[in-house]
Structures are given as C-alpha cells and as structure tokens.
Amino acid sequence: MRIAFAPVVAFTLLASAAVAGPMTPGERQRLIAHLEMTEAWLEDEVRNLSDAQLNFKMTPTSWSVEEVVMHLAIAEPQYWDQFKQSLAKPPQPDFKPQTTDVAMLWYGIDRTQRTTTGEARVPRDQFPDMKSSLASFKKLRAEMMKTAKESQEDLRGRQFLTASQDLYQWFLMISSHSHRHIMQIREVKAHKGFPKK
C-alpha cells in the first residue's frame, strides 16, 4: 500500500499560508500529491476483493465497500461541478477564507465526527458494479489532475460558492473527502465479520 508521502503532505499543508494569486509551486505540488495519494489508496483498498467482501455491511444500514466507491463516483462530479461554477466567477481580491488548509486535510482523517450525505449522493445502484464506479471515479480524477497541474487561475482569490473556503481549499476538500471514505473502507475491512475471501 502506497502511504509514504502522506506525512509530507500533512507537514507541508501545516506550513502553508493562503495567498491570493495562481497556485505557488508548493501549493500545486501538495494538491497533486494528495490527489495521487487518495486515488492510489482507493485502488489498493478495493483490489482483488471478492463479491462477498465488496458487499459486506457492518450493520444493515451501513455502507458496503462497493457502496462507498459508488458514493465517491456520484459525489465527486457534483463537487467538481461546484468547483467549476465558482471558477467561472471573477476573483474577489478582498475575500479572506475563514478556515485553513489544515482543516480541509483533517476532514479526511478525523472519522470521530460523522456526517450524513445529501440524498443526491446516496448510492442506489447508479452503477452496475464496483469496477464501473471506480472507472468513473478515475476518469474524473484525470480531469482534476490536469487542472491541478496546468491551471493558472487564481484559486485563492475566489470564494467557493457562499462558503468560508477559498477555491484552492475546496479542491483540497474533494481529495480529502475521498480520504475520509478510504478510512471508512478500512473500517469495514477491519470488522470481525468481514469475509476472509
């Protein structure tokens, strides 16, 4: 499992400060690294799982691994559309975010605070199987990665919709949201009832 650069991402995010203008080399590197990390981790967690393992639920109302991946394939396009809506608006030089990059990262790590997703992001067989969900996730991630590598837009100077984050922080949040659900998959796989094969 590829985890080596997670501490580096965390450290450099802790050291960063929000500055208006195009992404700095450090900001770009951190964003790319986090996107790469979460995509690689997700693939690692679901690789070679059987149907029984993919469909196991810890409780009748909890999500299976397959449903978690489906949720990501449903949710990330919605979050990305919101990103693009905000990007289409002109920068706001006076906008100051009321949160930090670290808070965006911590959202993916801290599973003690549980939330309920919106109805439009609940997995309900929107994809025929896990492979289809994962393929859709990866296709959108390729678009995100291209933006992360090439964009010269001012993400710091743009507010995400009406929220307290700047647009760079929302980009981080999308990847951090995946991290959060990767942690959820690990919880499912660590459950005593999880099938051995």
Q: Predicted regions: what is each one?
A:
Residues 18-30, 81-139, 162-165, 191-197:
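Short, helix-capping/interhelical loops that line the mouth of catalytic, cofactor-
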Residues 139-147:
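Amphipathic alpha-helical packing segments from all-alpha helical-bundle domains
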Residues 55-104, 146, 150-197:
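Short, contiguous alpha-helical
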Residues 13-15, 21, 29-32, 36, ...:
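Domain-scale detector for complete catalytic domains at protein termini or as standalone homologs
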Residues 25-32, 53-70, 123-134, 167-171:
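Second-shell loop/turn segments in exported
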